[in-house]
């Protein structure tokens, strides 16, 4: 039974993990140099496309203002309901405020006041609802506790009723037994 030589070699080759001496010592930077060059080439190719006249960012003026302003302005453009809170952040925000949230418009001021009043009423109703719910939960807990006590004290009544039912469910069979004691001083008992 002879095995093929290429699957089970008789001897092993020992390879060095170090590069051949004519390449010089290998550093961390050298290992990733081809990858870094590829990224650099991709960035250069993208820069050429971005600087061409056909390509323009829609908010190029915001890119020059700074990171914080840019994020705020972008957020306000997507959701202009926050413009009142952000009105002092940048020029674009102030423009949006004047168009979307016109603070000087009396009709909008009246609507804002109605909204605030409605929110306050909703908050009061929510608090009242929570109070009523808590009260109901307390009463339900007390009622269930009372029912458990009644069940413990008077469970024998329902058991007796179940045992004394005959064929007719509305007719209870009750038997009386009179006990007499041999002692004449103890009265007779009916059970």
From Swiss-Prot:
Q: SMART domains, per this entry? A: CLa
Q: Which Pfam families match?
A: Clusterin (PF01093)
Instruction: Name the InterPro entries for this protein.
Output: Clusterin-like, Clusterin_C, Clusterin_CS
Q: What is its main location?
A: secreted
Where Phosphoserine occurs, the residues are 184
Enumerate the PROSITE patterns for this protein: CLUSTERIN_2 (PS00493)
Q: Name one GO biological process term.
A: spermatogenesis
UniProt keywords (A-Z) are: Chaperone, Cytoplasm, Cytoplasmic vesicle, Developmental protein, Differentiation, Disulfide bond, Endoplasmic reticulum, Glycoprotein, Membrane, Microsome, Mitochondrion, Nucleus, Phosphoprotein, Secreted, Spermatogenesis, Ubl conjugation
One GO molecular function term of this record is:
unfolded protein binding
Q: Is Signal a UniProt keyword of this protein?
A: no
| Glycosylated residues, chain numbering | 79, 116, 142, 162
Q: Where in the cell is it found?
A: Secreted; Nucleus; Cytoplasm; Mitochondrion membrane
Recorded topology in the membrane: Peripheral membrane protein
Q: How is it modified after translation?
A: Proteolytically cleaved on its way through the secretory system, probably within the Golgi lumen. Proteolytic cleavage is not necessary for its chaperone activity. All non-secreted forms are not proteolytically cleaved. Chaperone activity of uncleaved forms is dependent on a non-reducing environment. Polyubiquitinated, leading to proteasomal degradation. Under cellular stress, the intracellular level of cleaved form is reduced due to proteasomal degradation.
Give the GO cellular component terms, alphabetically. chromaffin granule; cytoplasm; cytosol; extracellular space; intracellular membrane-bounded organelle; mitochondrial inner membrane; mitochondrion; nucleus
The UniProt subunit note reads as follows:
Antiparallel disulfide-linked heterodimer of an alpha chain and a beta chain. Self-associates and forms higher oligomers. Interacts with a broad range of misfolded proteins, including APP, APOC2 and LYZ. Slightly acidic pH promotes interaction with misfolded proteins. Forms high-molecular weight oligomers upon interaction with misfolded proteins. Interacts with APOA1, LRP2, CLUAP1 and PON1. Interacts with the complement membrane attack complex. Interacts (via alpha chain) with XRCC6.
Role this protein plays: Functions as extracellular chaperone that prevents aggregation of non native proteins. Prevents stress-induced aggregation of blood plasma proteins. Inhibits formation of amyloid fibrils by APP, APOC2, B2M, CALCA, CSN3, SNCA and aggregation-prone LYZ variants (in vitro). Does not require ATP. Maintains partially unfolded proteins in a state appropriate for subsequent refolding by other chaperones, such as HSPA8/HSC70. Does not refold proteins by itself.
The entry assigns this protein to a family as follows: Belongs to the clusterin family.
Protein's UniProt name: Clusterin
Task: Tell me the organism.
Answer: Mesocricetus auratus (Golden hamster)
Which gene is the coding source of this polypeptide chain? CLU
């Amino acid at each position: 039974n002879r095995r093929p030589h290429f699957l089970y070699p008789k001897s092993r080759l020992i390879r060095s993990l170090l590069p051949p001496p004519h390449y010089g010592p290998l550093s961390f930077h050298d290992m990733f140099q081809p990858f870094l060059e590829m990224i650099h080439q991709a960035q250069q190719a993208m820069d050429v496309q971005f600087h061409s006249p056909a390509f323009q960012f829609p908010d190029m003026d915001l890119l020059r203002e700074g990171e914080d302003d840019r994020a705020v302005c972008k957020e306000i453009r997507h959701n202009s309901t926050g413009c009142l809170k952000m009105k002092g952040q940048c020029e674009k925000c102030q423009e949006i405020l004047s168009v979307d949230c016109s603070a000087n418009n009396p009709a909008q001021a009246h609507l804002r006041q109605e909204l605030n009043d409605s929110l306050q009423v909703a908050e009061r109703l929510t608090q009242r609802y929570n109070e009523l719910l808590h009260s109901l939960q307390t009463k339900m807990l007390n009622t269930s506790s009372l029912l458990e006590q009644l069940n413990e004290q008077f469970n024998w009544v329902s058991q007796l009723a179940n045992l004394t039912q005959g064929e007719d469910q509305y007719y209870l069979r009750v038997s009386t037994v009179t006990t007499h004691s041999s002692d004449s001083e103890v009265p007779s008992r009916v059970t």
